[in-house]
């Protein structure tokens, strides 16, 4: 029983909901949750249980996922969950190359052997897609290397964000995409500091190549200072 309990505890620590659960315990109650790179909506489904009163917006680049995401949204009545189909980036562009894969679709092509299809999609900025978001906001960006581009395209909307979750790479998994060191610098410049890590992904030989990092705004009471133990 102790072994099972230890495994469950380890899984809770490594899952994004574990990080957010700890933030909830510290009093974090977002008014808005942005799920950028929503894919099948599973992240929104699980996090909605943590923050039932929040308005959720799922943004996904692949139009083929719209119906699946709509089913997720309809499970929460009252218009609390919205679905938007859009490829987000740092600028407005009529056409950009996009590599369609089962779970790793991206502007930045994966350096893997998994099958993909090259297409072109229009790109927009988040601050063109949404005019405002209620604070405090939680923003999760999981877009296979385009995280900083999406953040740049958020413009003044970032001012409402208290907690950010970004997929961060420590190896060149997506060709030309920023790696962890650049992400940390850019996020500090934007006013955010690391809080937690979750969802570690390993490749051949157990090599860690990316994980989700949770950031909170500088000076936030969510990030403790002083005596920690």
Q: Would you name each region that the model predicts?
A:
Residues 1-229:
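Phosphate/nucleotide-binding beta-alpha loop and adjacent structural elements of enzyme active sites
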């Amino acid at each position: 029983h102790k072994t099972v309990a230890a495994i469950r505890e380890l899984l809770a620590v490594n899952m994004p909901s574990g990080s957010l659960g700890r933030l909830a315990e510290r009093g974090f109650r977002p008014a808005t949750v942005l799920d950028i790179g929503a894919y099948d909506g599973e992240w929104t489904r699980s996090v909605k249980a943590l923050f039932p009163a929040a308005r959720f917006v799922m943004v996904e680049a692949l139009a083929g996922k719209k119906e699946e995401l709509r089913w997720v949204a309809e499970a929460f009545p009252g218009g609390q969950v919205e679905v938007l189909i859009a490829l987000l980036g740092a600028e407005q562009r009529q056409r950009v190359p996009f590599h369609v894969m089962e779970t790793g679709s991206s502007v930045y092509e994966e350096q893997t052997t998994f099958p993909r299809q090259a297409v072109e999609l229009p790109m927009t900025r988040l601050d063109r897609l949404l005019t405002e978001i209620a604070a405090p906001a939680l923003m999760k960006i999981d877009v296979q290397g385009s995280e900083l581009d999406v953040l740049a395209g958020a413009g003044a909307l970032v001012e409402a964000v208290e907690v950010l979750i970004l997929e961060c790479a420590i190896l060149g998994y997506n060709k030309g995409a920023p790696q962890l060191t650049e992400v940390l610098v850019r996020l500090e410049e934007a006013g955010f500091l690391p809080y937690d890590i979750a969802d570690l992904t390993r490749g051949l030989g157990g090599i860690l190549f990316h994980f989700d990092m949770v950031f909170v705004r500088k000076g936030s009471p969510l990030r403790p200072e002083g005596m920690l133990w």
